[in-house]
Amino acid sequence: MFLNLLDAPRRLLALVALGCVALLAFGLYLQHVVGLEPCPMCIVQRYALVLVAIVAGLTAITSNKKGLITGSGVLLLLAGFGAFVAARQSFLQWYPPEVASCGRDFYGMIETFPLQRAIPMIFKGSGDCAKVDWTFLGGSIANWSFVCFAVIGLTALTLIARLARQR
């Protein structure tokens, strides 16, 4: 089935956008129904997922090959960024900092500090980022987020390679 979707890149990109919307909806369910509060790194991953959904959706409506390749390239970069943040959070969960502090929340960091100071603070993580509140099949939300971003990145890379070979 996946190989059939590769022959229809616009359909595959629409499926990626729809999958991202479903993941975002599940994140909101975990936050507002289950009661899990997202940490700063979770929020950055959500923003990356929103951008992936927008780029995948816009690229899906593109009809020319150059636009599909360019959109898939941007998708690859965004998925790589999301995977990096998820991998960093997974690392913090596996090897929590010795001094776990709650730290500031995401918006507090952005509002209080200049951007060049706030961004490193976000990636440093806090006690909240190292905490595992929910698991599925032994993986935390950050672990599954990494898997999703990796699949999106591999899909974009495969699309680029396939489209570049077509005449």
From Swiss-Prot:
Signal peptide: none annotated. Keywords: Cell inner membrane, Cell membrane, Chaperone, Disulfide bond, Electron transport, Membrane, Oxidoreductase, Redox-active center, Transmembrane, Transmembrane helix, Transport. GO terms for biological process: protein folding. It holds the Pfam family DsbB. InterPro entries: DiS_bond_form_DsbB/BdbC, Disulphide_bond_form_DsbB, DsbB, DsbB-like_sf. One of its GO terms (molecular function) is electron transfer activity. It is a multi-pass membrane protein. GO terms for cellular component: plasma membrane. The keyword Acetylation does not apply. Residues 1-12, 64-69, 163-167 are cytoplasmic. The chain crosses the membrane at residues 13-29, 48-63, 70-87, 144-162. It is found in: Cell inner membrane. Disulfide bonds join 39-42, 102-129. Residues 30-47, 88-143 are periplasmic. PANTHER family: DISULFIDE BOND FORMATION PROTEIN B. Belongs to the DsbB family. Required for disulfide bond formation in some periplasmic proteins. Acts by oxidizing the DsbA protein. This is Disulfide bond formation protein B. It comes from Polaromonas naphthalenivorans (strain CJ2). The lineage of its organism: Bacteria, Pseudomonadati, Pseudomonadota, Betaproteobacteria, Burkholderiales.
